[in-house]
Amino acid sequence: QIKLVDRTFNADPDRARQLFRFILDRHRRSHFHFEIAAHLLDDETLALLDEVPPGTFQFEIGVQSTQDATLRAIDRPAALERLEHAVRRLKSAGRVKLHLDLVAGLPGDSYSDFLASIDRVAALSPDHLQVELVKLLPGTPLRGRAVSGGLRFDPNPPYTVLATSELT
């Protein structure tokens, strides 16, 4: 299995299609894991992905949260409706395995917000739904805003958030 762990892999749709086509033309027996931004998958790319032999590609999609305010707070705005459209289309084609990620403990996310995110993402029927606690890595903008944002975290690796102003 070959993993490409760059969540901006498909930020340039033409480049992503070229790489997908290269793989499909030469490596149909290999397995590839991509981190992608599903809201950036356009119709042309989705049509190309209809050609993928089942089990060849797995997409890891970092949804993080389905709350717009939370996504803005972590500088990860996403067109959730477009993301959901892409995931539904990929799911209905049944060719790409879908691994969707949510993060617990994000600033601004209440317990009910987080449960709503789980419900909304689970409704997409991904092959795998992963929930992680947010980590405040040194040098990141989120860690820089931790105290003012009401985040308490373990100062030792992996720097897991222990409480937020909304969750304890």
List each language-model region with its residue ranges.
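Conserved SAM/AdoMet-binding glycine-rich loop
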Residues: 1-107
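Short, hinge-like loop/turn segments at secondary-structure boundaries
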Residues: 20-22, 50, 117, 146-149
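Catalytic cores of alpha/beta
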Residues: 42-49, 107-125
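Flexible glycine/acidic-rich beta-alpha junction loops that bind and position SAM and/or redox cofactors
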Residues: 13-14, 63, 68-74, 104-113, ...
